[in-house]
Amino acid sequence: NNNLPNQFYLSENYPNPFNPTTQFSYQIPEFSDVELAVYDIQGNLVKMIFKGSHKPGEFKVMVNSDNMASGYYMTVLKAGDLILTQKMMLLK
């Protein structure tokens, strides 16, 4: 299928800074074991968005800032040895 992405990709979130919600997109080129999560700047897990076997394609995610304090966070996409990150800022 020519519509499938050919590489892993994690976009920046929008809007950034955000309050109360933000969204981003990501691409998975093949069936993969994937972990998609938000971490605080100290490396603590804040929200696990997805963990498990993931089908290929392009996907959009909305993140709600419930139970999150103002500050910097990292969106992290892990697939095998690959790790992609994007920084985002919550302003309450």
Give each language-model segment a name:
Residues 1-38, 60-65, 79:
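Glycine-centered coil/turn sites that cap beta-strands in beta-rich domains
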Residues 1, 49-50:
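Intrinsically disordered, low-complexity boundary segments flanking structured domains
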Residues 88-92:
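Short beta-strand edge segments in extracellular beta-sheet folds
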Residues 50-83:
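Short, surface-exposed loop/turn motifs with a glycine/proline- and acidic-biased composition
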